[in-house]
């Protein structure tokens, strides 16, 4: 299965670390979603979409990208880094729904802690400093292996 990782990682490159980890495990090509054209997905069977969580959802660039693609029958997975990863189901809902509306089969979802310094958290030195850490990376590898089994 030919895999592609599309991600957006801004402030601390938390999501980029996770994207690279998953890409290594899947032997996937990896791109910042802003650097590719939507027709790139035609060359792949499996596409991972990920970003940090901004105001409760994935970065808007992912949604803009998906708005430009036609309906498909490809497989996908979702990943993110967040200040509050236990809210993954809620954070991923909008992207999950968008992918399903485009015909993607969702194989899994992953979220881990990410260093978060936005807004008031900056005043206190941030939330989840030193994340993603080694344990988060290990869990991302395990997640990628589980995707290969699907």
Curated annotation (Swiss-Prot):
PROSITE patterns reported for this sequence: FLAVODOXIN_LIKE (PS50902)
SUPFAM superfamilies named among the record's database cross-references: Flavoproteins
Name recorded for this polypeptide: Uncharacterized protein MJ0298
InterPro entries registered for this protein in UniProt: Flavodoxin/NO_synth (IPR008254), Flavodoxin_dom (IPR026816), Flavoprotein-like_sf (IPR029039), Protoporphyrinogen_IX_DH (IPR052200)
GO biological process, one term: heme biosynthetic process
GO MF terms held by the record: FMN binding; menaquinone-dependent protoporphyrinogen oxidase activity
Domain Flavodoxin-like, first and last residues per copy: 4-148
Origin superkingdom: Archaea
């Amino acid at each position: 299965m030919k895999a592609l990782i599309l991600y957006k990682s801004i402030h601390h490159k938390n999501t980029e670390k996770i994207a690279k980890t998953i890409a290594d495990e899947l032997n996937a090509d990896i791109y910042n979603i802003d650097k590719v054209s939507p027709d790139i997905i035609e060359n792949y069977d499996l596409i991972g979409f990920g970003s940090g969580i901004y105001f409760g959802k994935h970065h808007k660039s992912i949604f803009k990208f998906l708005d430009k693609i036609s309906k498909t029958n490809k497989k996908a997975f979702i990943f993110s880094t967040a200040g509050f990863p236990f809210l993954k189901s809620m954070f991923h809902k909008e992207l999950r729904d968008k992918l399903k509306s485009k015909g993607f089969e969702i194989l899994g979802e992953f979220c881990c802690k990410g260093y978060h310094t936005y807004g008031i958290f900056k005043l206190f030195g941030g939330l989840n400093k030193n994340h993603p850490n080694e344990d988060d990376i290990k869990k991302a590898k395990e997640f990628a292996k589980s995707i290969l089994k699907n």
